Amino acid sequence: MNILGVRYGHDASAALIIDGQIIADVAEERFTRVKNDASFPINSIQYCLKAGNINSKELDCLAIPTTFVQDAFHSFFSIPEPILPQTQNKTARGLRKYIGNVFSEKILKDQIYSSSISPVLPLYQKPLELSETCKIYFVEHHLAHAASACYTSGIHGEKALVVTMDGVGDLVSNAIWRFENNCIESLKKFDNTSSLGWFYANATEAMGWRQSCDEWKLMGLAPYGTAQPKALLGFYPEFKNGDLVKQHNYGEFGRWNDHGAIHYHGKDAFKLNRLVHELGIENFSAEVQRVIEEQAFNIILPWLEKENTRHLICSGGCFMNVKLNQKLWNTGKLDTHWIYPNAGDAGIALGSALHAYYTTYPDKQHQKLTHLYSGPEYTNAEIKEILIGRGLVYKYVENPSEVAAKYLVRNYVVGWFQGRMEAGSRALGNRSILMSPLKAENKNILNHKIKFREHFRPFAPAVIIEKMHDYFVNPREEGFMTCSFDVVQEKRESIPAVVHVDGTARPQMVSREANPRFYDLIRRFGELTEEYVILNTSFNVKGEPIVQHPREALKCFFDTGMDVLIINNYVIEKPALQV
């Protein structure tokens, strides 16, 4: 069964599964080079179909992770007479332009404006040619989040609590589910007056950053400050015993502008900005982080007790917060804590496809996700052609892992471009910038000369999985950088470039099965230095998506202070290194 999931909105993406196997999963931003791109993901769709060696008419199912499409039609079109053409409302006119971008005039006139409008008429009919037998599934936003996590968790025969938490999707901000016997059951949903994601977004905007994009910065800054309890009361919803006890009216959080795009803005950001100045940026960030942890605990822990389970599954953008995830793990109340690694909205294309598959085949047993390498890859022949076309000096090596490890020992910055690109926002050893973790100053070198970003933002360690207990307190096998851990005290001075100011790190535990070439690199570095850890950060600069194509890797390499670029088996050095 061929199922294509398509997410249209911010963090647009597409994912293809064939007979339950994940074939491709990629965000549109990687092709357009627009961070968090919200345009229709036609490039992602084309890649998915190519990866599956099929065309759109061979799709058995199109899965769309929203039910709001139909609501939008009924909100802005009075059937059979549409409201939209008569209104001067800016929001309505903006939505009309949005719809016009993906619908042909014929579809608009013949189907949307008719009383026979199908409840499953997709926005995707214009750019995709589907067969008449292709089924179309609309999957509620948070159910798609839940499915992305449940059907990749590897949990069988046990009951698990599932929590999805983000800004808002299909008018839901947080949701509680039960996962048992491969079935997802809804237990509780909270509307947008309950959104902790919007609170965090408002706080991010108050700091002068972009909400729904720069929340990482606030999380990274928080450990530099001291939380100020009660300082932010009145700006967030409050929970107790697993339920909402105080709503927060966020007002209109977004509107459709004249260009046919949604513009997000939180009214609380102006008021919160005054508190940023009163408290200081570090203390403000620390209090925001304290609030999100406190309120998430007030939701999750009572529900764990109600469900009498020690297995927790999470997805949604709020669970990209690695400090929250660490606090949950350290409660001692969990035997299993699975966070879908592509937890933001880019991950719900896959979630909707998985839900469609396991709804169709409920007796099929899902497989635990072992890697996220589901994007484009390039052959040595393709790369060599690009290098020759650029007139670059290069060399071919049989063992790039060995070569890279030796460069790192010499404290060079290495661009590392290998195999299939990762899905999600974290570089996991295929589109990475690497450096030795042994010198504290390497953190500043990378922030200032390579990434061009704020000094307080930490870097992640990649460690071979057999050594995780040597470096981290109370670790679990964590291959996707979804949780931070305390670094073992005696190791903090040994690998200072990957230890944050609070003594934590957000590691990727690398197994040879998941990524043999990256594993061999780290292992060889360990043999040479006695530390089986390297510094791993995403292959991009601030404000840009992770590189997807070799040409983008070359541009980033020459635009920054990287010393060496290794693309598959080819090595390119900066002129200063060429002797």
Enumerate the predicted regions with their spans.
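Extreme N-terminal starter segment of soluble prokaryotic enzymes
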Residues: 1-4
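Flexible beta->alpha loop and helix N-cap segments adjacent to enzyme active/binding sites
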Residues: 7-25, 32-35, 78, 85-86, ...
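N-terminal phosphate-binding loop and adjacent alpha-helix
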Residues: 30-54, 296
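Phosphate/pyrophosphate-binding loops at sites that engage ATP/ADP/AMP, CoA/4′-phosphopantetheine
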Residues: 45-60, 299-308
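Short beta-strand-loop/turn "lid" adjacent to the catalytic site in phosphate-handling enzymes
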Residues: 55-123, 147-148
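Short acidic-aromatic active-site loops that bind/stabilize oxyanions
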Residues: 109-114, 136-139, 274, 278-294, ...
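Phosphate/ATP-binding catalytic cores across multiple sugar-kinase/actin-like superfamilies
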Residues: 286-312
